Amino acid sequence: LAKFGDAEAAIRLIDEVGKGTHLGRILGNGAAFTARAFGIERAPVVKGQAMPAYDPRAIQGIGVTYATSTMGADHTAGYAIATNVLKVGGFVDPLKPEGQVELSRNLQIATAAIDSTGMCLFIAFAVLDQPETFQALLDLLNAFYGLSLTADSVADLGKTILRAEREFNIG
């Protein structure tokens, strides 16, 4: 279809998708579908979702997230880049397995809770680097929605959402 780095070929393939040609419809269905259509056994996908921005071989925390999240290869489901690379909220060595499971789990729980508020995931940076901002966030949500959220109830909310997503995926 195209050699690596061939920008003109890439644009032609995107045009195929836009035109809705047979090839374009295959490509437009994503990496997993395209691989199956062409008989390719190995494609950079997890749970049918194409590999996003970060390579899990170099950042093990994001690899754990890809493998365990309800969405597959979604770096925003548990943004381990924050702690593995940017050192936000601490540091877990991205090249060592120690601490990756706990990091990914905690970030997935927090992300599910944040997503449910309609706020951008990146508010987590402020909370991770300045823990006192977490209470300010709770105060804001409680005032806006008329709730009585606590740190524990937010964690429970994230866990409940992840359980519901898993049940949906199974059902």
Residue ranges of predicted features:
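Extended C-terminal regions of large enzymes
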Residues: 2-171
